[in-house]
A protein has these predicted regions:
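Nucleotide-sugar-dependent glycosyltransferase catalytic core
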Residues: 70-87, 178-181, 210
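Conserved helix-loop functional segments at active or binding sites
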Residues: 28, 40, 65, 99, ...
Length: 210
């Protein structure tokens, strides 16, 4: 989903995209003009990507080219990776967003950049929603807020957009996409499971904790 849809749409729409650390080719001049690599965030690739684009450099995302990549081999490695990416993205947002909003890029680019760099803030809300599920069950069973719960049930439709996002990305790259999309509930459960880990990363990033 990230590569097939997000990166493709951002690139074609003129929005800022991020280099993912691997599978890319940089011009040496671009890196030097952007101020070289910085070590003040955990996601130096995201940081450099934005600094380069703010001074006029542009990336070209080649969707039809593939490159080998390694995935975490066990759950602790995955949690460490997600923690690093989440905390680093928050650190980068604190560092880069003031520069984005002071720049002369179009308003739509500023808004999209804000959504992009702050999207990990959703994890504390996912965690909060999970915690509140238990008391909500008892409140609902009391029968005193039927209208409220009837209206709130409409928000379940929000999951439809996530499902379509991943369904179309899998359909585009895999002939047997139906076999993969049935794992979507497992993916959502995994995202919920990472909420504690990633929420801690968000707060550490916000508090500039090293």
């Amino acid at each position: 989903g990230h590569f097939v849809i997000e990166q493709t749409v951002r690139n074609r729409s003129g929005f800022f995209i991020n280099f993912n650390g691997t599978g890319g080719v940089w011009r040496k001049k671009c890196i030097e003009e952007a101020g070289n690599w910085h070590a003040d965030t955990l996601t130096e690739d995201l940081d450099l990507s934005y600094r380069a684009q703010l001074i006029g450099w542009r990336f070209v995302f080649l969707k039809d080219f593939t490159s080998p990549a390694e995935l975490p081999s066990e759950i602790n490695a995955l949690k460490a990776q997600q923690f690093r990416w989440t905390k680093g993205a928050v650190e980068t947002a604190k560092k880069i967003l003031p520069l984005v909003w002071k720049s002369k890029v179009p308003l739509r680019v500023k808004l999209q950049s804000t959504f992009h760099l702050t999207n990990n803030l959703v994890f504390p809300f996912i965690l909060l929603a999970a915690i509140l599920n238990v008391p909500l069950i008892f409140i609902k069973n009391s029968g005193s807020h039927d209208v409220y719960f009837a209206i709130m049930s409409l928000f379940v439709l929000a999951f439809v957009s996530s499902f379509l996002f991943y369904m179309y990305s899998q359909k585009h790259i895999r002939a047997a996409w139906r076999k993969k999309i049935v794992m979507f509930p497992l993916f959502m459960a995994g995202s919920m499971g990472l909420a504690v880990n990633n929420s801690r990363a968000v707060f550490e990033g916000l508090m500039s904790r090293k």
